[in-house]
C-alpha cells in the first residue's frame, strides 16, 4: 500500500518530466508566444515575431530566446543582420514599413500579420484577387498569386504559387482549404 501511495505522489512529477523531455527536442517555436523572450524589455521581447522568425535559423532562435538583457539583444540583432548583408536588411526594412501601412489590424503591426509576413518575405504578389468562401457565413477569401518565375524571397525560398487569406474577427489570417472527403461508392447490402 505504501508503494502505491508513493507512486501516486510521484506521478505528477514524472508527468512533468516526460512533458519537458518531449519539448526539449523541438527544433523551432510553434507559436507567436514561443517567440517572445520575457527577460527583455518591450523594444526587444517580441523581436522574433513576424518575418524575422522565418529568416532566423533554429540556432539563432534558441540563442535569442536565451538572451538576458536588451544590450545583448541589440548586439544579437546587429550580428543577425550583418550575416545577411545590407541588401536583405534594406529590403526587409522597406517592406516592413509598407506592410505596416497596408496590413496593420487587430492591434498588430502589419509586418507581424499573416499577409505582412508573406509581403515582407516575398514582396508584392504578382496578382491579387478574391474567391467565394465555401462557408456562406465567411467573408471572401483574398488570394495572392506569385508567378512560377518569382524570385527567391528574403528567406532564400521561392514563394508558394498561391496564398489565401480570410478575415477571422479583427485579423486576416492564412487560409488553407480543407481537403474534400473522398466520395465512397455505395455499398450493396
Set out the residue ranges of the language-model regions.
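Bacterial N-terminal signal peptides that target proteins for export
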Residues: 2-13
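C-terminal motif of bacterial Sec signal peptides marking the signal peptidase cleavage site
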Residues: 20-22
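Residues within mature, well-folded domains
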Residues: 24-189
Amino acid at each position: 500500500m505504501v508503494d502505491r501511495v508513493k507512486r501516486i505522489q510521484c506521478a505528477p512529477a514524472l508527468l512533468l518530466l516526460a512533458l519537458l523531455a518531449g519539448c526539449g527536442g523541438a527544433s523551432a517555436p510553434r507559436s507567436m508566444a514561443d517567440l517572445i523572450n520575457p527577460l527583455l524589455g518591450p523594444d526587444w521581447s517580441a523581436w522574433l515575431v513576424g518575418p524575422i522568425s522565418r529568416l532566423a535559423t533554429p540556432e539563432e532562435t534558441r540563442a535569442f530566446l536565451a538572451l538576458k538583457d536588451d544590450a545583448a539583444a541589440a548586439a544579437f540583432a546587429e550580428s543577425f543582420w550583418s550575416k545577411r548583408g545590407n541588401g536583405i536588411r534594406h529590403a526587409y526594412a522597406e517592406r516592413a514599413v509598407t506592410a505596416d501601412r497596408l496590413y496593420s489590424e487587430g492591434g498588430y503591426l502589419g509586418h507581424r500579420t499573416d499577409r505582412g509576413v508573406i509581403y515582407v518575405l516575398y514582396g508584392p504578389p504578382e496578382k491579387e484577387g478574391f474567391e467565394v468562401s465555401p462557408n456562406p457565413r465567411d467573408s471572401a477569401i483574398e488570394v495572392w498569386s506569385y508567378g512560377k518565375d518569382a524570385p527567391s524571397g528574403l528567406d532564400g525560398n521561392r514563394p508558394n504559387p498561391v496564398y489565401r487569406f480570410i478575415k477571422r474577427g479583427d485579423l486576416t489570417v492564412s487560409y488553407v482549404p480543407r481537403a474534400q472527403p473522398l466520395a465512397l461508392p455505395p455499398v450493396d447490402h
